[in-house]
Design a protein with these regions (language model features):
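Transmembrane-helix signature of polytopic, membrane-embedded enzymes
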Residues: 2-4, 85, 102-123, 140-141, ...
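Membrane-interface transmembrane helices that cradle and orient dolichyl/undecaprenyl
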Residues: 107-110, 146-163, 171, 193, ...
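Short helix- or helix-capping micro-motifs
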Residues: 116-124, 148, 168, 172
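Membrane-lumen/periplasm interface segments of specific transmembrane helices
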Residues: 183-287, 377-390, 394
Length: 587
């Protein structure tokens, strides 16, 4: 009990400081599914989808079954609305359960289960994702709990087998990828010729998932996994996935190079990775060298795992470890071949088995030696990620809210966290064909997740100001400019890097307030031939008029709108006429 309390406190110590973390990545999609579950519990995916400007009738191709979203729906029922801190704190039950499940397995398979479990709790991948609402930790928690309960059954605990089966069902109900380690577990049971009831307890999970997918296929008229796989296999590059897999394995399992073998594997690993770097381009030599450092460390980890697995096989001992030996290569190979990218959360799924095999006989002293610097690294990465995801929420509060108070109508052309916080303020997200914005409306877009808008919208919009979102903290975890891809290797082939590159650039554009304006290469223009022309509109407060003018004329702001007055010339041209918030000019 003392050990469990210690483990729970360590997990909470990694979550509580970051519980105010802003919504980011796919969290806004999970929250949308959770809200939809209140009106369509069985099929929460049956809600209109808008993703990167593309509209679809539903989220039938959503990459996760809805069990995890049901828990979020429960939190919505309790609080009535989304709140970062209580949602993340109550979501921590999954992180605690995952560590408890790992500890139970470590007690069975390793010499120092407590310290190994502490190492797992502070590993970078687990530590960072524990404070998120992503579904990887809940899926892993149910999976590890199921394995732990199964071995409890093997030791004679009554009633543990059906509980184990229920955990497996929940795991695949949260994420399809739980089927990979579960398949390895089933293969291990078959090889050991375990009783039929044990085999059935595992088979129950894919059977339950299949039944649900059949129901979804009947309801939506499409088979969800086929849609998901059809997208993934057309997006990824196997070679880039291999490169990213090596660097991520070497950097987010434990502190780099603390898992090392003999000098020959180390030398061989560095040379092998250096050769691999010849087959792709690199933004700089420094970046390439950083990749070699991390990727060669990852290759050593995999070589060490292979050696430990071979030693385990040669020993002839079999206390149920067979599935651990299969789990790591099967999971990593799956993501390399199927994934559209590599992410730290993908490596997380293989991490328990990797630890249980590599550190099977590790001494307490060695584990302490590894745990301390790993915890420091994890804290650094968690803080860096915390800063990067919070900039969107902070920017919306500091910039968008005042614009709304001044009377501007605002639209969103954003995704992920920025989209979520704009929508929280009642701002509608535009599709690529939506022509709803009217003259004088503002549109918020950003560089990180940029997508095209309707031609008429893009042609008549004028960028008022571009904001650079950044921080002085010198570590980046998810940053295309820096090449850091902790959450997505398409951003970079290393999970983190030392850099102060800007997180994102957010632009605020305005639909030209002059309704009769037309497109030109230099921006929207209005040709005036009449002596006066009025444009009725409500002018937001605390603003000023800016424009470029070819000819002699003047613009008068009235309570009812704008009056354009032409001079003696037969025609004048107003170019980039805009209503600018005064705070933009001051900034």
């Amino acid at each position: 009990m003392k050990h469990h309390l210690l483990l729970a406190l360590v997990v909470l110590a990694g979550i509580v400081p970051f519980s105010s973390r802003a919504v980011y990545m796919d969290e806004h999609i999970f929250l949308l599914m959770a809200r939809s579950a209140h009106t369509n519990f069985l099929f929460p995916q049956d809600t209109p989808a808008l993703f990167f400007g593309q509209t679809r009738p539903s989220f039938v191709g959503h990459t996760h079954p809805p069990v995890g979203e049901y828990y979020l729906a429960l939190l919505y029922s309790i609080f009535g609305e989304f709140r970062e801190v209580p949602f993340r704190l109550l979501f921590s039950v999954f992180a605690i359960a995952a560590v408890f499940g790992f500890y139970a397995l470590a007690k069975r398979f390793t010499a120092n289960p407590l310290w190994l479990s502490l190492l797992f709790a502070v590993s970078p991948a687990f530590f960072v994702y524990s404070a998120t609402l992503m579904m990887d930790v809940p899926m892993l928690a149910c999976l590890l709990a199921g394995f732990a309960l199964y071995f409890g059954h093997v030791q004679g605990r009554r009633g543990f087998l059906p509980l184990s089966s229920m955990c497996f069902i929940l795991a695949v109900g949260i994420g399809y990828t739980a089927l990979v380690p579960l398949g390895c577990f089933f293969a291990g049971l078959l090889a050991a010729r375990r009783p039929l009831k044990e085999l059935l307890s595992v088979v129950a999970a894919p059977v339950a998932l299949t039944l649900y997918l059949v129901a979804m296929t009947i309801h939506f008229g499409a088979f969800p996994p086929a849609l998901t796989l059809g997208y993934l296999v057309t997006q990824g590059s196997v070679f880039r996935n291999v490169l990213a897999l090596l660097s991520f394995t070497g950097a987010i399992g434990v502190f780099p190079w603390l898992v090392s073998g003999k000098r020959l594997p180390i030398t061989t690993s560095v040379l092998a990775v250096a050769i691999l770097t010849l087959f792709t381009s690199w933004p700089s030599m420094v970046y390439r060298l950083w990749f070699i450092v991390l990727a060669s460390s990852g290759l050593v980890v995999l070589i060490t795992f292979a050696g430990a697995a071979r030693k385990l096989i040669v020993s002839g001992k079999n206390t149920g470890e067979a599935f651990l030996i299969l789990w790591v290569p099967a999971t990593l190979l799956f993501f390399v071949l199927i994934g559209d990218m590599i992410s730290a959360r993908y490596i997380l799924l293989a991490l328990p088995a990797l630890y249980l095999v590599i550190f099977r006989d590790a001494s307490e002293r060695r584990l302490i030696y590894i745990t301390v610097p790993t915890a420091v690294l994890s804290l650094t990465l968690a803080y860096a990620d915390f800063i990067s995801v919070n900039v969107n929420r902070d920017w919306v509060q500091q910039t968008v809210v005042p614009l709304q108070q001044e009377g501007f109508r605002i639209w969103s052309g954003a995704e992920s966290g920025l989209r979520f916080y704009l929508e929280q303020k009642g701002i509608q997200t535009l599709s690529a064909t939506d022509v709803s914005p009217k003259p004088g409306d503002l549109i918020v877009r950003h560089k990180l997740y940029h997508y095209g808008l309707a031609d008429s919208v893009g042609a008549l919009s004028i960028i008022l100001k571009t904001f650079t979102l950044t921080s002085a903290f010198p570590v980046r975890t998810y940053n295309q400019a820096a090449g850091a891809g902790f959450h997505d290797s398409n951003m970079g082939l290393v999970p983190f890097i030392f850099s102060r590159a800007a997180f994102d650039e957010v632009e605020v554009a305005e639909m030209c307030p002059l309704e009769a304006a037309v497109w030109s290469p230099e921006g929207p223009i209005f040709m005036q031939r009449e002596a006066e022309r009025e444009f009725p509109m409500k002018i937001p407060s605390n603003t000023k008029i800016e424009y470029e003018l070819d000819g002699d004329g003047a613009a008068a702001v009235m309570t009812s709108g704008i009056r354009l007055i032409k001079g003696p010339a037969p025609r004048i041209v107003w170019r980039n006429f805009r209503i600018v918030p005064k705070q933009f000019a001051l900034q």
